[in-house]
């Protein structure tokens, strides 16, 4: 009797584990790499594309998003410069 109860509990536990870990892919794209390729072709869709500041824009030691990665100090303050 105890063995039967233990087997039933084990089967219920394994069934519950399978139900919670199944992939619910309903309504999703079959191949996620294809979705990534589409995003790479269209940069407006991609969140991975970063914008940079052109030469002449203001920058600082802590905020340097210059396209050239060069932030030089001038009389008017630090600005992005050309390489």
UniProtKB/Swiss-Prot annotation:
GO cellular component, one term: extracellular region
Disulfide bonds: 52-67, 59-71, 66-80
Major subcellular location class: secreted
InterPro entries to which the protein is assigned, alphabetical: Conotoxin
Pfam family, one: Conotoxin
Tissue expression: Expressed by the venom duct.
Gene Ontology molecular function, alphabetical: ion channel inhibitor activity; toxin activity
Proregion span(s): 23-50
Keywords: Disulfide bond, Knottin, Neurotoxin, Secreted, Signal, Toxin
Secretion signal, residue range per the UniProt entry: 1-22
Cellular localization per UniProt: Secreted
Family of the protein in this entry: Belongs to the conotoxin O1 superfamily.
Domain notes: The presence of a 'disulfide through disulfide knot' structurally defines this protein as a knottin. The cysteine framework is VI/VII (C-C-CC-C-C).
Protein name per Swiss-Prot or TrEMBL: Conotoxin LiCr95
Protein's organism: Conus lividus
Lineage of producing organism: Eukaryota, Metazoa, Spiralia, Lophotrochozoa, Mollusca
